[in-house]
């Protein structure tokens, strides 16, 4: 990594990972911040606000919740709020304490602003119903940041759920060189092309950082998050993202070439990798089905040993999302 600005950013990230591994009190502090979620007052403000639509960056496509009227109702309400109270949602997102003034852009953080997210016990069930509305709001927030911010570094974070992307963002948000951070899956990179192009066209530097973990470690992290916060991760989504990510990154590298920096962080070893071929080799653990089998083996072992609750197992085995 020869870019001195990027080198400083990665050094900060590496120090953060070392502290997480070596200082239990620091890990507890960071996890407390992560699991706090959006303050209830922000959701209340959105509910009280009047209609204030703004153009959205994309169409919100509803998922099919046939036979599940509760989820269908959650989805309809989320879509209505996203289209009718867009300005209030974006303003609340900027004030969300975990977003660094709105610079950290993540659809999961937008979910915290919807009424269905208020109860932790309901979050795993509500997740899919809020997904598409939150994804479009995240794209809209990214466009707003490009409109109002001076060009800096736009960092795209990706990796299997449970890799530690959101945890890592806490360190990177403190670095003023990072103007925005967009967390999202790049295993199917088509939706990322216009976002990255928009950043480049406005003079921003763009780097993609893939955070890597073994499937088993990622599963342990999502299960821990489920019990602490209510949102875990399905095996289908985890395996699809990890199994397809090397090809997705290769497609992005082929399209943008030297206009972007492609990097990987192995959270298991602490290694930073900036050679595209080495990144592909490190991240390639097999196709989605191979990774799915590893995850199922580990989940079954936890279940057989009595270390897994029925609710945690159910959320890991079910999703409406298709990747």
Residue ranges: model-predicted function:
Residues 1-323:
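Glycine-rich phosphate-binding loop of ATP-dependent small-molecule kinases
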């Amino acid at each position: 990594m020869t870019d001195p600005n990027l080198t400083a950013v990665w050094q900060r990230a590496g120090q953060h990972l070392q502290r997480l591994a070596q200082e239990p009190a620091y890990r507890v502090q960071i996890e407390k911040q992560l699991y706090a979620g959006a303050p209830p007052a922000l959701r209340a403000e959105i509910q009280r606000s009047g209609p204030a639509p703004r153009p959205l960056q994309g169409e919100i496509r509803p998922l099919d919740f046939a036979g599940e009227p509760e989820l269908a109702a959650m989805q309809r309400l989320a879509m209505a709020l996203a289209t009718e109270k867009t300005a209030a949602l974006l303003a609340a997102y900027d004030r969300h304490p975990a977003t660094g003034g709105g610079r950290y852009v993540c659809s999961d953080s937008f979910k915290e602003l919807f009424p269905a997210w208020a109860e932790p016990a309901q979050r795993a069930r509500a997740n899919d119903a809020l997904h598409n509305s939150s994804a479009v709001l995240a794209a809209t927030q990214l466009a707003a940041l490009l409109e109002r911010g001076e060009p800096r570094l736009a960092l795209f974070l990706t990796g299997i759920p449970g890799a530690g992307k959101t945890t890592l963002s806490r360190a990177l948000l403190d670095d003023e060189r990072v103007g925005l951070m967009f967390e999202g899956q790049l295993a199917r990179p088509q939706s990322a092309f216009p976002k990255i192009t928009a950043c480049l066209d406005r003079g921003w530097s763009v780097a993609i950082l893939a955070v890597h973990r073994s499937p088993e470690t990622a599963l342990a992290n999502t299960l821990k998050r489920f019990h602490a916060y209510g949102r875990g991760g399905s095996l289908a989504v985890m395996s699809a993202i990890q199994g397809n990510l090397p090809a997705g990154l290769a497609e992005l590298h082929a399209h943008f070439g030297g206009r972007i920096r492609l990097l990987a962080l192995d959270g298991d070893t602490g290694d930073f990798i900036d050679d595209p071929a080495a990144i592909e080799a490190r991240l390639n653990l097999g196709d989605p089905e191979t990774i799915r089998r590893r995850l199922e083996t580990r989940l079954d072992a936890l279940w057989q040993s009595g270390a897994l609750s029925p609710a945690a197992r159910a959320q890991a085995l079910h999703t409406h999302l298709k990747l």
